[in-house]
Amino acid sequence: MSHLMKNYGRLPVSFDHGQGVWLWDKEGHKYLDALAGIAVNSVGHAHPRLVRAIADQASKLIHCSNYFNIDLQEQVAEKLVEHSGLEAVFFCNSGLEANECAIKIARKFGHAKGIEVPNIIVLKHAFHGRSIATLSATGNPSVRADFSPYTEGFIFVDESDLDGIRKIVEENKNVVAIFFEPILGEGGVVPIDLSVIKGIREICDEHDLLMMCDEVQCGMGPVSYTHLTLPTTPYV
């Protein structure tokens, strides 16, 4: 009998160890890991350099909050800024938290402009997380079911409806950001047309909005680093 909450549809397999792209279950069966922990084990399993780095750090410090300067954070942030073309980095615990931060940035941006009730345009088939705020920004009815009331302030449009996006922005002066996945990952791997993304950036520049890309799934390397291949760079 399991004492875990039944909130996951678990498969009847329990893994024992992994090496590179391979996994072995407790019975010794070998599997090619095409899931990568839902796109987070981007360097594979038991990479010797990573194992050494984790063991070395664990022997020194496990955690020492962000009240203090952390040299390794600074080093990694510098590399991320160098390779991404963005200006600053916020480290957090999950993709959900990253998207919550993006939503907060957009709202704070709106408040700084004197907008009391900031609105964010999101896409109907995107997935941004399972917290109340990120769930409210997610259009999949099967994910949203049973968790209302939702956080207000999100406006859904079809991912190909650039004219619809422009119309909303022109009619609703509370819009502060357009938030989207360059590759929609929840219902299949569906890239958004580059002309649409270019148009979104033009709308954002024209109306002083934030263009925010959620690459928690597609940005960890499985399908390249999408924003680096886009015709424009996001603000967030």
Describe these PLM feature segments.
Residues M1-Q19, A36:
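Active-site-adjacent loop/helix segments that line or gate small-molecule/cofactor pockets in enzymes
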Residues S2, K30-I115:
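Glycine-rich loop-to-alpha-helix module at the N-terminal edge of alpha/beta enzyme cores
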Residues D25-K26:
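Short, acidic, Ser/Thr-enriched surface-loop or helix-capping motifs
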Residues V40-S42, G185-G188, C218-M220:
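Short, small-residue-enriched loops and turns at beta-alpha junctions
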Residues A77-V176:
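PLP-dependent aspartate aminotransferase-fold enzymes
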Residues V175-V189:
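Short acidic, glycine-rich surface-loop motifs adjacent to enzyme active sites
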Residues V190-V223:
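Catalytic PLP-binding core of fold-type I/II PLP enzymes
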Residues T226-T232:
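Conserved small/polar residues in nucleotide/adenosyl-binding loops
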